[in-house]
């Protein structure tokens, strides 16, 4: 991996391309990210670049993290993430990673925490079928069978049941970068990206490029 950046989700809109085709896009405020540490094989056992994103007040930073930022002589940041760049040696502390690291036509993977839906039933959470809707039916949205009776006499692990839905780390692969606004550090990505507005999104060059 050579390209990655942290961003916040602004929302969705739609744009027309050169052929007049309407395309739904997600607007991402990407960077600028500041390099807070460069890790090397000699010192850390692997090559990586640690970046900070989104300014934060000093009183909201604990002492160990504050010392880390002070050592790097960079502003305090809300998020710290690490990317295993193949070209990590090309970066230095205080360098900035901006939206221009990507270009229109690039394929990226977007990772974020999905929207939380709370406690949901098996129909909404897992797409299970509902029961008969006739007047004499014993249930409509209740779950069906959970397994056999005496044998095995238990519910198997992994059985789909009602429970908490959402708030999971989701990655959408092979999204196309439609447009990059270098001046405002904005990236437009084709399609939807997980998470609510203002949530943190990690953009990386895709690991499964379309053939």
Swiss-Prot record:
GO MF, one example: structural constituent of ribosome
Any Gene Ontology CC annotation: cytosolic large ribosomal subunit
NCBIfam families listed in its UniProt record: L3_bact
Family: Belongs to the universal ribosomal protein uL3 family.
Function: One of the primary rRNA binding proteins, it binds directly near the 3'-end of the 23S rRNA, where it nucleates assembly of the 50S subunit.
Subunit structure: Part of the 50S ribosomal subunit. Forms a cluster with proteins L14 and L19.
Recorded coiled-coil stretches: none
Protein name per UniProt: Large ribosomal subunit protein uL3
Gene Ontology biological-process annotations: translation
Pfam families referenced in this protein's UniProt entry, alphabetically: Ribosomal_L3
Residue span of region Disordered: 130-154
SUPFAM superfamilies: Translation proteins
Gene3D superfamilies linked to this entry: 3.30.160.810, Translation factors
Keyword field: Ribonucleoprotein, Ribosomal protein, RNA-binding, rRNA-binding
PANTHER family for the chain: 50S RIBOSOMAL PROTEIN L3, LARGE RIBOSOMAL SUBUNIT PROTEIN UL3C
